[in-house]
UniProtKB/Swiss-Prot annotation:
Catalyzes the NADPH-dependent reduction of 7-cyano-7-deazaguanine (preQ0) to 7-aminomethyl-7-deazaguanine (preQ1). Belongs to the GTP cyclohydrolase I family. QueF type 2 subfamily. Keywords: Cytoplasm, NADP, Oxidoreductase, Queuosine biosynthesis. Pfam families: QueF, QueF_N. It comes from Pectobacterium atrosepticum (strain SCRI 1043 / ATCC BAA-672) (Erwinia carotovora subsp. atroseptica). This is NADPH-dependent 7-cyano-7-deazaguanine reductase. The active site is at 190 (thioimide intermediate), 197 (proton donor). Pathway: tRNA modification; tRNA-queuosine biosynthesis. GO terms for cellular component: cytoplasm.
Amino acid sequence: MSVYDKHQALSRLTLGKPTPYHDRYDAALLQPVPRSLNRDPLGIYPDSLPFHGADIWTLYELSWLNNRGVPQVAVGEMHLNAESLNLIESKSFKLYLNSFNQTTFDSWESVRATLANDLAHCAQGDVSVTLFKLSELEGQPLAGFTGECIDDQDIQIDNYNFNADYLATNEQDAPVVEETLVSHLLKSNCLITHQPDWGSVQIHYRGKRINREALLRYIVSFRHHNEFHEQCVERIFNDLMHYYQPEKLSVYARYTRRGGLDINPWRSNTPFNAPNGRLPRQ
């Protein structure tokens, strides 16, 4: 259980509550969650962030009406800067997108600009939005994380409660390496509803070699942990910095789709390119 899952900032959210669906545009449906909820306990403060990054959202269920009443459909891609004061709560995002369904817009650009403006206002940060016609995405192959997968280790695991101290199992004389490690065994739970969130995580670093067994046990220990996607990625980044102090560190997670949305947060203390390629489970 998170130390802040009963915080008053979460009590007003529609998440986990019966909610009517609106099909007329309503920006007020968007609900923010302060990033400080998980950052403050980790000692992460906005004036000295240890990383830069973004939350990359893919919007699969986006539709509106053109001036002649003909429905339009698109796939959207939204990048929310990690320096924003708030993250966007995903159920409210879904309800907000539903409100476009029977709303008339003059152009695709009007839709894009409306999305960008509303999301930036809710998050109190920088947002970019791109809309794709379906024909632009047809035939795109599934992507994969580059790096060495650590999932097939011959170990036994019998504890699935979150424990960052697994990472304390490091070698004092470990050599300095630069490598990319990947796991597809990241599973956490929604902070409010406790529904499972399934993800893959890529960790690129330069520093003392990370103990791969310890890292896998640490990742698996998220299975009973309740936090939003973005918060889990920041926790992983923070814990790796605490135990290993790498010179360079990038953490990128891609989660499976729910409600027509997938969320793919990344955090890094070095220049980092986060390709938005759909993984097999997405």
